[in-house]
Structures are given as C-alpha cells and as structure tokens.
Amino acid sequence: SDLAVGAADTPSYAMLVEMKAKAKDKFIRGIRAGGGEEVFHVFMSPQGMAKLKLDSDYLANVRNAGVRGSKNELFAGSTSVLVDGMWIHEYSHVLTPAASADTGEGAWGVKGQRVLMCGAQALAMADLGKPSWDEKDFDYNNQKGISTSKIMGMLKPKFHSIIDSGVEDFGLIAVDTA
C-alpha cells in the first residue's frame, strides 16, 4: 500500500500476528515443518529486529515461551527466532523502498524498511538435468580448457488474484515499517 509510514509504525508482535492472519485470509500456505505444522519465514533489517525486540508484547512472548537461562533466544543473541509459527530472521539486505540516496529517509522523513513474510511458493526454482563438464586440449596439449554448464533458474511467482482481480506476488506479504 502507498500509505504514509510514521515514526510510530515500527515492527511489533501485533504486526506479526496481523501479517499471519492476512496470509491465511489470502490463502498463502506456510512451509511444512518437521512435525507437519506450517511455518512462515519473516525477514527484516537489523534495525527492524532491534525495534521488534523492544516491543513489550514480543518481549513477554519470547521471554515466557522460551527456555529459561542463557539458552533463551532473547538472551543468546540469536538472529533467527521462532514466534507463533513464524521464523523471524534478521537480514541485512532488506529493501528500504522509500529511501533516498543521501539520507535513507522516505517521503515522510522516516527511515524505513520492508518486512517480508514468505510462505510456500514465495520463490520458484527450475533445475533441468545434471551439470555437464567438458575438457579440451589447446596449443598442442600445452593448455587445457574446461567448460561447465547447468540450466537452472529462480523467479518470484506472480499470479492473477481472484480476490483482488489484480496481479500480485504469490506466497509473500510485504509491510513497510519505520
């Protein structure tokens, strides 16, 4: 959405719960985990993760749900935390869409970041066959040439939405925050 992002619009536990509910409303499937339950992967910048760790609801949930002592993810300095079926990852290369080149501030004077929630099929990969390896001699066997080839590719799927009647990313929700 193109709504204004204010300084108070920081990542929070409530935002994560709402993102997960929105994902289920949009029929975005989670990724099947070991026990058969669905999990989502959330990516945010180190600054976004720092702001999330300062959220009182997030702190209460991680503090009380996790193990006690130094193994608690909150105190162990973990960059990935599992909360309410969402793996939250700190990632340095998260898009800051409204940032200008000189200040890092968007159109509303707020330094922002984009939080991404990825479910199943947020990324598509095609892998066609085994790689090939070819060797050839040149210059009367004084030089060897080696060639490898592999056909593969990745893309972010986009589909026509029956809900919104538009083209949208598949398996992904993006939220801009301060």
What label would you give each PLM region?
Residues 2-25, 47-178:
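Sequence/fold signature of self-assembling virion shell proteins
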Residues 26-54:
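Structured, hydrophobic secondary-structure cores that serve as assembly/anchoring elements
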